[in-house]
Amino acid sequence: MNCLYLDGAAGVDVRKNYAFTARGREALCRRFLPLGGLVPVVTCGRTELYFPCPRADAERAFSAFLKERAACAREDNAQGSGAAGFSFCGGREAVLRLFRLAAGLLSMLRGEDEILGQVRDCYEFSRALGASAGMDAAFQAALACGKRVRAETKISSLACSIATLAANAAFRFCAGGNALIVGATGKMGGAVLKNIASKGGWKIVATSRSHAFAASAAGVTAADYAERYAFLDGADVIVSATASPHTVFTADKAAAALRTQKPRLFIDLSVPPDIEAGVADIPGCTLLGLDGFRAAAEENNEKKRSAIAAAEKIAEDCAEQFFADEAARKCAPALAALPEMERKSLYALRKSDAAAFCARAEALLAGKENP
C-alpha cells in the first residue's frame, strides 16, 4: 500500500483545492478502480490517498482526474493542479502513517477523537464502491489501533477539540454577547453551539439548511440559513462551520449587512473556507481560520507529551503486528512445511517479537531458509 498526502503542513489556501465532496471522492475512486482501488481520506485538515498501485500510476491517474474535474467545472473547488504538492510514502511507512492517523497522532490536536470516525467513514465509503480491495486488512487494523490507543492512554481525555478552541476564542473576544453560528447541525457547528451555550451570558442565533433543525438550548434561536446576513449586524461573534463548497459570507455582502461599526470576530472552521478573506478588511472585523488555532493546539499538545509517547508506541506495535500477520499469511505454505518444533517456535516469535518474525518470514519467502 502507498500513500500520497497533503496535510496541515500545507496552508488552507492549498488544502481547499483538494477538499473533495462525496461526488468528487466517488469519481476519484472509480478512476482508480482499474489500478486496484483507492481510499481517499478527506477532512478539513488533510487529503490523503491510499492505493495499492505504483506511485507513478497513481500520480498520472490523480492528475488526469483533476484536469477533467477542472475542465467540466461541475465539481466544486476544481482548482487542484496535480499531485506535485503531495508528499509520498510507501509500503511499511504508508501503513504506519495510516495507523498513526487513526490514532490521532497526525492531527493538529493530538489524540482528538473525530479523526477515527472520519477514517472509518472514508474507508466505508470506498468499500461500498468496491474500491478498497487489498487494503481492507490495513484499514481494519488501523481502526482497531485507534480504538486501542484511546482505551489504553489518556491522550483523548487530555485532548480538547477545534470546537473547544473556537469557543474559547469567542470567550476571550468578549465575556458575553450575541453569537451567530452557521452550520449548527453539523458535528463541528453543533459542538461550538453547545460550548458557547453552556457558558451563559450569550444569545445565540443558529442557522441551518435543515428544516428539521430546532434549537433546544436556552438562549438559542433557530433561523434559516438563507437569513444569515440579516443576523450579522447584531452579532459580536460569527462562527461558520458548514460543509458547503461555496462561500457562505462574501466580503461585499457582509460589509453591506454590517451597518453598526463595532468589534466583531469571524471564526471560519471549514475547508474550503466559508468566509471570504476580504471580511478581515472590514473595519472592526477580525477573521480567524482553522490554521489560526495552531498555537493553541501546540499548547494543548505539550500537556500530554507522555500520553502521546505511549500512543506512538502502541501505534508502532500495532503496525508491527499487522506486518507479522501479513507475513504469516504470505508464507503459510512454507511455514506449514517446517518441522513442528521449528514451526511452533516461529509462531511463538510472532507473538513475542513481531519484527523478528517478519525478518524470518521474509527469509523463508526468499528461500534463504530451507524447510
Q: Could you say what each language-model-derived stretch is?
A:
Residues G80-F173:
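Glycine/serine-rich phosphate-binding loop and adjoining beta1-alpha1 elements at the start
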Residues M1-N2, V12-C29, T43-R46, E124, ...:
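NAD(P)-dependent dehydrogenase/reductase Rossmann-like domain
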Residues Y18-A19, A254-L265, L269-P371:
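Adenosine-phosphate binding glycine-rich loop
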Residues F51-E59:
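Helix N-cap motif at beta-to-alpha junctions
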Residues I181-V182:
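Hydrophobic Val/Ile/Leu positions in short beta-strands of Rossmann-like dinucleotide-binding domains
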Residues M188-G190, K199-A218:
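NAD(P)-binding Rossmann-fold cofactor-contacting core
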Residues R228-A251, R264-I267, V271-P272:
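Rossmann-like NAD(P)-binding element
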Residues A58-A71:
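Short amphipathic alpha-helices in soluble, non-transmembrane regions
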